């Protein structure tokens, strides 16, 4: 895991840092990065080569526009890049325990916030969850939490503690950081 890149790269001025979910996303982002001249671009490498079969956006020129992939209410899950699959699993666990279908969001952009979408969530959501496969300190979730700082929205940020990991069991690291679907659902129930 490259767990320290998000805080380092996402705060460089004018840099666009993208987080693909699938191999197709990754290739489309690389193509866009090469074809456009407006910004320096960095693209994370997805942890898996999954394909969901849906059409892939080819143009990322509208910076910081997130994609709502499942519409729900009460809880919104913003699942970054390789943790999008975890977001899908957490959404199912939350729905099965609460009866409320969460909104699931693929942000694509690590470097900025979709202020328009985040503002809209205030109307019918009370909890926003962020999922990122990197350290929390200075990461993506902190950007979302900062956006909601002066509001009643509760933000639960999930990622890794700031520590060096060497020869580790990924499952144990996930459990230790409350990054399993059941742990996330439990936290949401306690927060609602």
Language model feature labels by segment:
Residues 1, 35-192:
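Thiamine diphosphate
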Residues 1-36, 187:
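Conserved thiamine diphosphate
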């Amino acid at each position: 895991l490259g767990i320290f890149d998000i805080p380092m790269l996402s705060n460089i001025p004018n840099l666009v840092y993208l987080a693909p979910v699938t191999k197709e996303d990754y290739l489309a982002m690389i193509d866009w990065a090469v074809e456009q001249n407006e910004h320096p671009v960095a693209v994370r490498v997805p942890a898996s080569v999954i394909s969901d079969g849906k059409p892939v956006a080819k143009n990322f020129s509208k910076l910081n526009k997130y994609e709502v992939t499942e519409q729900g209410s009460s809880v919104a899950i913003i699942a970054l890049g390789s943790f999008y699959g975890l977001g899908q699993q957490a959404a199912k666990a939350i729905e099965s325990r609460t009866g409320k279908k969460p909104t699931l969001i693929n942000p694509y952009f690590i470097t900025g916030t979709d202020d328009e979408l985040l503002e809209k969530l205030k109307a019918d959501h009370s909890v926003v969850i962020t999922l990122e496969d990197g350290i929390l300190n200075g990461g993506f979730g902190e950007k979302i939490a900062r956006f909601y700082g002066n509001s009643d929205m509760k933000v639960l940020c999930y990622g890794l503690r700031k520590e060096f990991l060497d020869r580790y069991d990924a499952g144990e690291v996930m459990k230790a950081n409350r990054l399993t679907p059941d742990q996330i659902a439990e936290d949401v129930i306690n927060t609602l």
